[in-house]
Amino acid sequence: MSAEVSTTPAADNTVNGTPEATNPAATSAPEVTAVESASPSATPSANQPHSASLYVGELDPSVTEAMLYELFSSIGQVASIRVCRDAVTRRSLGYAYVNYNNTADGERALEDLNYTLIKGKPCRIMWSQRDPALRKTGQGNVFIKNLDAAIDNKALHDTFAAFGNILSCKVAQDEFGNSKGYGFVHYETAEAANNAIKHVNGMLLNDKKVFVGHHISKKDRQSKFEEMKANFTNVYIKNIDQEVTDEEFRKMFEKFGEITSATLSRDQEGKSRGFGFVNFSTHDSAQAAVDEMNDKEIKGQKLYVGRAQKKHEREEELRKQYEAARLEKASKYQGVNLYVKNLTDDVDDEKLRELFSPFGTITSAKVMRDTVTAGETSESEKEKESNKENEKEGEEKTEEKPKESEEEAKKTEKKILGKSKGFGFVCFSSPDEASKAVTEMNQRMVNGKPLYVALAQRKDVRRSQLEASIQARNTIRQQQAAAAAGMPQPYMQPAVFYGPGQQGFIPAGQRGGMPFAPQPGMVMGIPGGRPGQYPGPFPGQQGGRGMGPNQQIPPNFQGIPMGAMQGPGGIPNGMGYPQMAQVQFGRGAGGRGQVPGMPMGQGMRGPGYGQGRGGAPVQGGPRPQGGRGQPAAAPPAAGREEVPATGGLTAQTLNAVPPPQQKQMLGEALYPKIQAQQPELAGKITGMLLEMDNTELLGLLEDEEALRAKVDEALSVYDEYMKNKGEGEAPAEPAKPKEDAAETATEENKS
């Protein structure tokens, strides 16, 4: 996931030179690692004489620019504040930059506001250093470990402030805010760091002896760790018989060389836990012990002898093994495992195998089913109830028989297969067989339903593809909406908070806008606008019944791009596919006129040709050349594409057009067929069916029986919805006059 560039230090916070350390900070939060490398200067005057920029880290994700402005404006005049956010999700990264007009205010804020609680978390303030070379130098950076849990950032700062000027100070914390027992102090000079190491290393802090040393970069630690692995002396042994004593355990390995320590791990009761450690004085002795004793059988148990590993090492190895096994499994079934959907309830594993057996060797075939819940009544439970009734009637039974019948009933209940979920998987022995099955079986009618057959995908792959398709679809909609409105593409600029009296500016690269001075407390989101007012009239409404120039718009429209207010074809974005279907198809056939005030654009023609109310031609006749609430001429929108004819729709035809037009073409083809069956609810049912996959909709166009079944199913769902809605509402209104019946039906279709 991409993130905005941080100007804070970015070294890692792992324990200094110790293998047991784990990486406490992921790269998703650059401010977490800011302590380890920073500017070697105490003030920005050395490299940036006119800079008064502060880095503010350890922020709660909910902290906003306004909250920071309220805090930092108490020191002096704030030039600007920016909370850094992820470029995609726009979530806060946990750090921000505060710019003052003069350096003195920045120094005072650094002194007075450092470690101030913001939403329950102490913030960490330091000078912003924009030079990456200076940020990455570890000069003056000190690492402290074995800290007491009660020592926080401020306590650590107060302890080490006596040895020199501190640029930044931090105690590493977990996700719950608890101390990890180590921290970092970054001094202005290397002399101050050496002085702190000399005086504090080995001292007691809160009755705990601390280690203080120079910070070692991750690269250097990694090379040192690899060297330690190659020259190990500590050996781990497991599968040890519990009867083996400490003396016997030591004698097993004395023949390989001098032993500095040998111990068996025991529980609280003193019993052996079956493993132990032996530390040799030399690496050669340890290597010889591993080579000879590994897999050797002692007292009936085969020993495991290997290099002793730290916990994080073992976790990393297990993670790599799991990842390798997952990739191997995925590659094994890549291209041979098929996903089959739209199965009828009577299709089981055997029938599924029979359907696909002509295409090759099947290694497995399975139909996914629901699990039987405890509340469902099975045949075994019915038998138990009848047995209880017989007992009440006076039949004598022993106590063992009911228990046996209950146990048998439980076993039988576990074996009962649940209802089919309508999909399954078929695995072939080769990719060629699988591809042949996809070609032949996809969209084939089985028991009156068209099958959907495709290569099976993992859940994470499907999710990523779905997210990518949704993002692409939204981008296309925004571009079409902007083109239809005749507006330039929106410029995505991060929000910047300007203080009172600060001059705004147009970002570099943006053209066509007019600079303006933002109002105090204004968040700049879209250049060229101001709160509560749009710079000009809405597009497409010069004159007529549209809004006049500089017309005020409601405050809740502030900061919303005008291109986002309309979808393709001028349809508001608040309307989904069902509503679009009613607008597009509900005004053609059946003698209804077009929507008042909305010109009939390209791709908006209904499937029928007739006259609307009042004799106005709907399709097949000339367009109206003006009228109330309608422009005199409706030129085709810029960037709009003509929707191809819907006759003889195929998958290739659909793939040649954007996704929104695919649904439009399918809707235009489905509407006349559905109207022939349900004239009153054709628009609603069309919208409901458009939620299905395009491949299934193509199958419905070819199969009248399957379409009729889907229409009946949609009608039953709609009736159930109206029934439930009617039960929860107030009593129905009185019957409306006959002359309003047509208008009522129209409003229902629009809802």
UniProtKB/Swiss-Prot annotation:
GO cellular component, one term: nucleus
Name the record gives this protein: Polyadenylate-binding protein, cytoplasmic and nuclear
Family: Belongs to the polyadenylate-binding protein type-1 family.
Places the protein is found: Cytoplasm; Nucleus
Single GO BP term: mRNA transport
Record has RNA-binding as a keyword: yes
UniProt keywords, alphabetically: Cytoplasm, mRNA processing, mRNA transport, Nucleus, Repeat, RNA-binding, Translation regulation, Transport
UniProt keyword Repeat, yes or no: yes
A Pfam family it matches: RRM_1
Gly residues compositional bias, start-end: 603-629
Sample GO molecular function, one term: RNA binding
Species: Neosartorya fischeri (strain ATCC 1020 / DSM 3700 / CBS 544.65 / FGSC A1164 / JCM 1740 / NRRL 181 / WB 181)
Regions of compositional bias (Polar residues) in chain numbering: 1-26, 36-50
Annotated InterPro entries: Nucleotide-bd_a/b_plait_sf (IPR012677), PABP-dom (IPR036053), PABP_1234 (IPR006515), PABP_HYD_C (IPR002004), PABP_RRM1 (IPR034364), RBD_domain_sf (IPR035979), RRM2_I_PABPs (IPR045305), RRM_dom (IPR000504)
Superkingdom as given in the UniProt entry: Eukaryota
Region (Disordered): 1-50, 371-413, 601-643, 725-751
